[in-house]
Amino acid sequence: MIKVGICDTTFARYDMGGAAIDELKKHTAGIKIIRRTVPGIKDLPVACKKLIEEEGCEMVMALGMPGPEEKDKVCAHEASTGLIQAQLMTNTHILEVFVHEDEEDDPEELKVLADNRAREHAQNLIMMLFKPDRLTREAGMGLREGKPDAGPL
């Protein structure tokens, strides 16, 4: 059975991990989902690495919602760097799914964005694991997660 890791934070203002799990359950069968929740985004890299090394996850989603302040953007960058290092150390994909609080002014629009981005990245995970040729066909299509696609040039 394929194991997939979901790692999210208590700092986030929306349950992106729950949305990703819901999407995975709707569109896959025979996978085991292991969820871990950490306080903030800087905790994601080690938690994701542990899901891979200790739980045997074949792919992991790291979901977080950095705040709007400059220090939050710095923390998001550091977390992103840590996630890249964890991927290289484990030779395993970790899909970074961040929604910055200042991407939308309206809380309802932020909620929709967070839900859509989590679900669309869950679809990416499914394609990477089970339908990699589909991603190849979509190369250069300007696809976006959470917002409208930009389209090809």
From Swiss-Prot:
Pathway in which this enzyme or protein is active: Cofactor biosynthesis; riboflavin biosynthesis; riboflavin from 2-hydroxy-3-oxobutyl phosphate and 5-amino-6-(D-ribitylamino)uracil: step 2/2
InterPro entries: LS/RS, LS/RS_sf, Ribfl_synth_arc
Domain of life: Archaea
Reaction equations catalysed: 2 6,7-dimethyl-8-(1-D-ribityl)lumazine + H(+) = 5-amino-6-(D-ribitylamino)uracil + riboflavin
GO molecular function, a single term: riboflavin synthase activity
Cellular component GO terms, alphabetical: riboflavin synthase complex
Cofactor(s) demanded: Mg(2+)
UniProt similarity note: Belongs to the DMRL synthase family.
Subunit structure: Homooligomer.
Listed name of the protein: Riboflavin synthase
Organism: Methanothermobacter thermautotrophicus (strain ATCC 29096 / DSM 1053 / JCM 10044 / NBRC 100330 / Delta H)
Lineage per the UniProt record: Archaea, Methanobacteriati, Methanobacteriota, Methanomada group, Methanobacteria
